[in-house]
């Protein structure tokens, strides 16, 4: 079936005629397949005497050329061109993608490592795991991805605050530079501690070393992450010796999150909001806050 489809002579209007090196014409099924999967280069569709063919121009020159009928052009469609390019630099990724956490280690070390090696940020599913298990995951992932992006989930645990505190302590101890904050109904001292402990004054401004991606489904929670840390949590962190006074002062100039993941109705617990309504609402809220404060938080 595939062979007959590929050999079909398309009745498409000719865009023009072009000279193509004979050696670069792909007219076999496996060659066509390889060309169409190459998203990083433009692919030219040709109506050759033998049927549909493709051509990816190279830098080489050849005297053995055939004049071909050009019927279409597939432009570059590299995944690296999709999304907000501003996501890639701070998160050290190739792609503006984030693979969110799945609890109890379902988003495993192996998954985080495999995606990280391809330049994609993924979160380890730390929710539901004790701090010692999280520590083992940190060590394994850091060994495999010494210079690559990765993140760890930080889930709000109102009934077991020790788990939230223990996770943050491990993240700070091992230098985990990005957490995905989920299930928060409000900010807590633990998430504020993680964020603010990574603030430093530099000649160029404020350096943020601890990144936060907040997964939210309610606008009132989104607002908490789009704005700076509240004074009451900063005071708690200062009283416990978790942050310095300088870091508390710097916290007034940065939002709590670098990125928001808008969580619409899905297979797990959500607030049953359809994405077509929730996403524009979150974007509107972000824009309103940015108009009043010099912050830039990405939303996806």
Predicted segments with their positions:
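Active-site entrance/lid segments in N-terminal catalytic domains of soluble metabolic enzymes
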Residues: 1-300
């Amino acid at each position: 079936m595939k062979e007959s489809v590929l050999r079909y002579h398309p009745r498409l209007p000719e865009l023009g005629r072009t000279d193509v090196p004979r050696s670069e014409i792909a007219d076999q099924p496996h060659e066509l397949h390889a060309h169409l999967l190459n998203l990083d280069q433009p692919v030219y569709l040709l109506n050759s005497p033998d049927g549909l063919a493709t051509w990816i121009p190279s830098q080489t020159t050849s005297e053995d050329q055939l004049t071909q009928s050009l019927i279409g052009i597939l432009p570059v469609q590299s995944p690296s061109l999709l999304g907000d390019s501003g996501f890639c630099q701070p998160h050290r990724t190739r792609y503006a993608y984030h693979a969110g956490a799945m609890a109890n280690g379902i988003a495993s070390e192996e998954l985080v490592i495999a995606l990280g090696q391809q330049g994609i940020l993924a979160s380890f599913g730390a929710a539901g795991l004790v701090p010692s298990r999280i520590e083992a995951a940190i060590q394994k992932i850091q060994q495999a991805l010494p210079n690559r992006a990765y993140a760890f989930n930080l889930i709000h645990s109102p009934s077991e605050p020790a788990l939230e505190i223990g996770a943050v302590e491990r993240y700070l101890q091992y230098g985990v530079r990005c957490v995905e904050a989920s299930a928060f109904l409000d900010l807590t001292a633990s998430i504020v501690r993680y964020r603010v402990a990574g603030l430093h004054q530099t000649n160029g401004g404020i350096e943020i070393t601890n990144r936060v991606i907040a997964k939210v489904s309610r606008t009132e929670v989104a607002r908490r992450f789009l704005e700076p840390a509240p004074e009451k949590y900063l005071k708690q962190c200062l009283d416990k010796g978790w942050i310095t006074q300088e870091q508390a002062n710097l916290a007034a100039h940065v939002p709590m999150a670098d990125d928001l993941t808008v969580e619409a109705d899905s297979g797990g617990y959500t607030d049953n909001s359809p994405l077509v309504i929730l996403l524009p609402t979150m974007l509107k809220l972000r824009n309103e806050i940015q108009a009043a404060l010099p912050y830039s938080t990405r939303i996806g």
